[in-house]
């Protein structure tokens, strides 16, 4: 899985979470955690990709 696929997965998950009523920041954090555990990527690496 390359960088763009990871970022795309995070954005898609964030959008789904935002549609449930979660605000954008909380949705991003939850999406990062979900993708981190789903694809076995360290959370710190995902946060570097996103730019946090």
Where are the regions a protein language model picked out?
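C-terminal alpha-helical interaction appendages
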Residues: 1-52
